[in-house]
């Protein structure tokens, strides 16, 4: 099953939501802004994730770079305005 994730990035934590193609919530969790923790949280869904969207706030660089370095090639930025 294809899955899609949105990552709502804040200064201290990230809210991760994962949806199926019918917009049913498959997973939700708030985690600390720690790349290893975020990658560990996403790992069970990695093969099914067809898109990840990160809010392009002032601090998005480390997260997007980390996701891309971990072979999440489907990372997109969303304009929060």
Which residues does each predicted region cover?
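Phosphate- and other anionic-substrate recognition elements at nucleic-acid/protein interfaces
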Residues: 1-81
